[in-house]
Amino acid sequence: MTGGKSGGKASGSKNAQSRSSKAGLAFPVGRVHRLLRKGNYAQRVGAGAPVYLAAVLEYLAAEILELAGNAARDNKKTRIIPRHLQLAIRNDEELNKLLGHVTIAQGGVLPNIHQNLLPKKTPKSGKGPSQEL
């Protein structure tokens, strides 16, 4: 018996690489896989399902954070707060449809004034053609 840390693996084996890094993702594929197994969504979970779900979650997070960052910059802030998330989601048609039933704590509401409540515009009399005969 030889002493060492090989543990029965081939001597030329590569270093361990996470499934997230193999897929080029920042979201944890292993954790998503564990949550899919423990959540009783199905008896069995395929190998590609957690990778795909982690990629979708990462894309959604990136999309929302980009729009929220733009909202924060428009308000001359450097930190994203729940209000910026609310503005980002409600001003985007597809995200609003996806997250329409979601309540964001401390998000506030969108600024909106009904047309009937706005002051009436009065026609200006002046340089128009004369109505006299």
Curated annotation (Swiss-Prot):
InterPro entries: Histone-fold, Histone_H2A, Histone_H2A/H2B/H3, Histone_H2A_C, Histone_H2A_CS
Annotated site residue numbers, Not ubiquitinated: 120
Entry-annotated residues carrying N5-methylglutamine: 106
UniProt KW Ribonucleoprotein keyword: no
Gene Ontology annotations for the cellular component aspect, listed alphabetically: nucleosome; nucleus
PROSITE patterns registered for this protein in UniProt: HISTONE_H2A
SUPFAM superfamilies: Histone-fold (SSF47113)
Compartments it resides in: Nucleus; Chromosome
Feature: compositional bias, Gly residues: 1-10
Any Pfam family hit: Histone
Keyword line: Acetylation, Chromosome, DNA damage, DNA repair, DNA-binding, Methylation, Nucleosome core, Nucleus, Phosphoprotein
Any single biological process term in GO: heterochromatin formation
Main location per the UniProt record: nucleus
Modified residues (N6-acetyllysine): 5, 9
Molecular-function annotations in GO: DNA binding; protein heterodimerization activity; structural constituent of chromatin
Residue numbers covered by motif [ST]-Q motif: 130-131
Protein purpose: Core component of nucleosome which plays a central role in DNA double strand break (DSB) repair. Nucleosomes wrap and compact DNA into chromatin, limiting DNA accessibility to the cellular machineries which require DNA as a template. Histones thereby play a central role in transcription regulation, DNA repair, DNA replication and chromosomal stability. DNA accessibility is regulated via a complex set of post-translational modifications of histones, also called histone code, and nucleosome remodeling.
Record remark: domains: The [ST]-Q motif constitutes a recognition sequence for kinases from the PI3/PI4-kinase family.
Assembly and interaction partners: The nucleosome is a histone octamer containing two molecules each of H2A, H2B, H3 and H4 assembled in one H3-H4 heterotetramer and two H2A-H2B heterodimers. The octamer wraps approximately 147 bp of DNA.
Family: Belongs to the histone H2A family.
Note from the entry: In contrast to vertebrates and insects, its C-terminus is not monoubiquitinated.
Record-given protein name: Histone H2A
Native species: Aspergillus fumigatus (strain ATCC MYA-4609 / CBS 101355 / FGSC A1100 / Af293)
Lineage: Eukaryota, Fungi, Dikarya, Ascomycota, Pezizomycotina
